[in-house]
């Protein structure tokens, strides 16, 4: 497959067919990632997506920018290129080859480039010392940056002054003021949050050695349950990672529908003092907590219900029962223990609604329990109708895109948008086409000028095979920009959805979730609209003004602004209104090369 665009020419062989066209948020691989040096067996090993593999490969052996075409072999070019998409497909590959079977496990060397502060103009080339061994630099980087916030007063962050308890992760390489109210995983697991008794970590990707080191030394031997979706070789690799740790047990989430993933990211933290729930967007690997924009919701510290009392411990948002229902969907004995723990705690102070997805085919009232129908039900029951609602846009922001069909009517602007448009019991759904839809997904230029450079695109696994089938979608795309939080150059792995006012000064609701823009994550109707089919596990929290005694939230002008703004202003982590792609912008596609311009480390992107 020969292609050409603003960022260079390339060829993709049929063996590079990506599983991204399958409807799932991240593409699992059975690859194990190892650091190739003495003692490699002791380095982190974890399964990840094909896109993440490519990013790791280019961190090991970056391809330095060159003004010549000598890097790539001569290519055939088809006449009548898709100029509007920026890609040109050779005629011999117009029909995609059948999907290749999942590759067998292979070992890939990892190297992390030494962190360098953000570029002044976004185009400056980076230079670095390549003399040190790759894994030595990785260790230096982790030691230097994986410490909790210096001088950060955790108590100030957890006090009642922040009604939303919505945070971003710390980003290495931004000004300190943009990390002053952000959290690292070490902060979350800190003794300041509670005296840990045991914990459960729900996630997609695990680096077990790294994870254990994020716990304080005094908590590292406390029981840890890892809830994952790995199968076959990937499962074997995860078990091998966990084997040295007697306190770690594993729970495999059942994934009975093809191409589903366990994408949920949640921590259950049981303390001597109570229980805390953390719902977030980061994989449990170093890169996800380093230079990306990620979201975190922290629950209050839930006290234990005194024995002999008949208090339910339920919140006005029904969070306790909904969390238990979500955990019961796993049908796993090891989670029954955590369900019992939750039953014994008072969750009544919770002010968010839980929105989950679990694999299955749901009919009747069960259809409203999960996915976009769950969002629709909550918006119907608890959101306030707005005058001129048809002029209130819908915003979706995500880090991957599934296959959404031949045109917008197949899913995006039919069932999905209809759920997003719901506002109150009496509100009529406005004409679906009349409500503006803003989709935020990083452009190639966003990735090129990011702190990580092109390897940031390893966590944005939108493939050419999927993208070329839905050119119509990209007219909705808007750039990533986050001056409000100092994260314009920290590529987003966070996923958010919201309903802002026409002038973007207010929002009717805000959702932070693990769910990307895919049918696998949100569900798709079957059987003439009577059945909702979901492939994956996802989890997020919905902020509704009614739970805070409000009709709408005002948007906070600066994400990290202090007490000068009213308490009830909501901290949206990126800039509003979103900026539409320019005529030369293209969505980031992970599995094609970009060789015409260097990234912030002076490198090109040649993924294979």
UniProtKB/Swiss-Prot annotation:
GO biological process: DNA repair; double-strand break repair; single strand break repair
GO molecular function, one term: 3'-tyrosyl-DNA phosphodiesterase activity
EC number(s) recorded for this UniProt protein: 3.1.4.-
Entries under Pfam families matching the protein: Tyr-DNA_phospho
Effect of residue 493 to R: In SCAN1; reduces enzyme activity and leads to the accumulation of covalent complexes between TDP1 and DNA
Domain of life of the source: Eukaryota
SUPFAM superfamilies, alphabetized: Phospholipase D/nuclease
Keywords annotated in UniProt: Cytoplasm, Disease variant, DNA damage, DNA repair, Exonuclease, Hydrolase, Neurodegeneration, Nuclease, Nucleus, Phosphoprotein, Repeat
Effect of residue 265 to A: Abolishes hydrolysis of the covalent intermediate between the active site nucleophile and DNA
Region of interest (Disordered), ranges: 1-101
Record's GO cellular component terms: cytoplasm; intracellular membrane-bounded organelle; nucleoplasm; nucleus; plasma membrane
Annotated site residue numbers, Interaction with DNA: 518
Gene3D superfamilies with a match to the protein in the record: Endonuclease Chain A
Disease per UniProt entry: Spinocerebellar ataxia, autosomal recessive, with axonal neuropathy 1: A form of spinocerebellar ataxia, a clinically and genetically heterogeneous group of cerebellar disorders. Patients show progressive incoordination of gait and often poor coordination of hands, speech and eye movements, due to degeneration of the cerebellum with variable involvement of the brainstem and spinal cord.
Protein name (Swiss-Prot/TrEMBL): Tyrosyl-DNA phosphodiesterase 1
Protein species of origin: Homo sapiens
Primary gene name: TDP1
